[in-house]
């Protein structure tokens, strides 16, 4: 997904007795490091502790003219804490980074402005005052290297801002009477910011009847072109799924949903008599929304957290087996094309007493992955995060499918932590997968939102 550019406020500090040219040069280099990393800055010149407080007032006014996701509080040297607090207090509602710069080597000697004297005098003070911030610092061996940590936290700040505006649509409620998918709307809105809206299956069923045949045929042609079927299907076999996709997308557009969860087993399969895998695929790939089955509200919120941090799809997977050093994850329905290795592959399959429907049997990309899940217990929210190496699984099948059983989209994830440790912390059957090492960004986002990481 396309991510908007991050905007950060930036204010530097240095004592009035420190060489002004040196303070300005250090702040400009820090500024350049962030801008080279892609951040847009609302910049104000460095502030000193002048007795009249003129620099403080100027910085507050200049920062107030901009709108930013976070404020970078950059100490280029020692500064009395009251000067910093006076400048940043009007922005206490914003996430912040306390960034201590470092001295420089000049002809073999270290020349320092006591940057970490300033940050060490502020870290606990800012914590005590309730600022939501991350503390990072440079070393003489690696000046401005902490810029990468600032950028990581900035990505978390952007994600937090997007979550405050996010909305999840949920067709039906509590599929299969599951407990692990339940949520508390008020605490979720307070902690994360996401609003979850429920709508009825009947509304979608009625809207499906209103879909024009002329709207179905073009999408059917796209599907037949983009998906590889094991055997050519009849367009009529695809019609119900296309109608449902168009009906749900109308609701998505009306209400501005960024994620969708549908009542699957007790809804689409039981009442409409077809498996909704195809609907989820279209919603993810054509509609551009996060998708997860079974009314999994916190699973959908976890997807949004991953999407807003990384720009990735945030595909859901569920656990099939725990092994000695790995876990088998897979899905009995679909994966978004963003995680498919090669072309999307589907077949017409029958499971149990359900009518035949589209089943995704694509091969899933391997590599370094993160698996994470948000859960709540009362007002307390927790995020379980594990990392590992995803590999192509051995031959396996899920009991219940008509033979020959399909090869479901799946991975074996060799965990970086012992499986037993993972198992004793697991929070539900659905976890959200992302590629690369996203642990730091997830940690930062949870820290910002007050979510415990386990």
Labelled PLM ranges:
Residues 287-399:
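C-terminal catalytic subdomain
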Residues 356-454:
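Extended hydrophobic packing segments that form well-structured cores
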Residues 55-68, 85-88, 245-254:
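Short, well-structured alpha-helical segments in soluble
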Residues 1-35:
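N-terminal basic/disordered segments at the start of proteins
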Residues 87-113, 121-127, 132, 281-295:
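Short, acidic/small-residue loops that bind anionic groups at enzyme active sites
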Residues 3-8, 41-42, 104-233:
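Cap/lid and interdomain-hinge subdomains that line or gate substrate/regulatory clefts
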Residues 68-77, 97-99, 257-262:
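Periplasmic-binding protein-like
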Residues 222-309:
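Long, internal scaffold/assembly segments composed of regular secondary structure
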């Amino acid at each position: 997904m396309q991510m908007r550019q991050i905007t950060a406020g930036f204010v530097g500090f240095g004592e009035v007795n420190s060489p002004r040219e040196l303070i300005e040069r250090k702040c400009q280099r820090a500024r350049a490091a962030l801008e080279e990393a892609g951040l847009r800055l609302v910049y104000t010149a460095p502030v000193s502790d002048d007795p009249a407080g003129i620099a403080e007032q100027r910085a507050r006014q200049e920062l107030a003219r901009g709108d930013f996701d976070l404020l970078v509080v950059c100490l280029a040297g020692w500064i009395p804490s009251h000067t910093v607090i006076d400048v940043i207090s009007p922005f206490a509602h914003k996430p912040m980074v306390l960034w201590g710069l470092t001295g420089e080597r000049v002809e073999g000697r270290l020349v320092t402005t006591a940057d970490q004297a300033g940050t060490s005098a502020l870290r606990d003070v800012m914590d005590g005052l309730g600022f939501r911030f991350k503390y990072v610092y440079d070393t003489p061996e690696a000046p401005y290297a902490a810029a990468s940590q600032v950028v990581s936290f900035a990505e978390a700040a952007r994600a937090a801002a997007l979550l405050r505006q996010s909305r999840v649509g949920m067709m039906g409620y509590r599929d299969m009477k599951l407990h692990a998918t339940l949520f508390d709307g008020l605490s979720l809105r307070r902690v994360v910011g996401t609003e979850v809206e429920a709508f009825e299956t009947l509304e979608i069923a009625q809207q499906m009847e209103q879909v024009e045949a002329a709207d179905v045929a073009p999408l059917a042609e796209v599907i037949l072109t983009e998906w590889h079927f094991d055997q050519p299907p009849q367009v009529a076999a695809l019609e119900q799924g296309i109608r449902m996709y168009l009906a749900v997308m109308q609701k998505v557009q009306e209400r501005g949903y960024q994620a969708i969860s549908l009542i699957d087993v007790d809804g689409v399969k039981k009442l409409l008599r077809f498996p909704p895998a195809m609907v989820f695929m279209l919603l993810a790939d054509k509609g551009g929304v996060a998708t997860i089955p079974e009314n999994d509200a916190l699973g959908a919120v976890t997807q949004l957290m991953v999407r807003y941090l990384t720009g990735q799809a945030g595909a859901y997977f569920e656990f099939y087996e725990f092994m000695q050093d790995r876990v088998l994850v897979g899905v009995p329905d679909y994966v978004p094309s963003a995680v498919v290795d090669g072309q999307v592959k589907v077949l017409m399959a029958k499971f149990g007493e359900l009518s035949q429907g589209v089943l995704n049997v694509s091969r899933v990309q391997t590599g370094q992955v993160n698996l994470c899940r948000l859960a709540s217990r009362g007002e307390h929210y927790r995020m379980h995060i594990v990392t590992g190496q995803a590999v192509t699984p051995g031959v396996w099948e899920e009991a219940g499918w008509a033979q020959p059983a399909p090869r479901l989209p799946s991975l074996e994830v060799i965990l970086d932590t012992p499986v037993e440790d993972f198992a004793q912390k697991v929070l539900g059957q659905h976890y959200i997968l992302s590629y690369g090492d996203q642990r730091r960004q997830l940690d930062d986002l949870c820290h910002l939102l007050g979510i415990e990481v386990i």
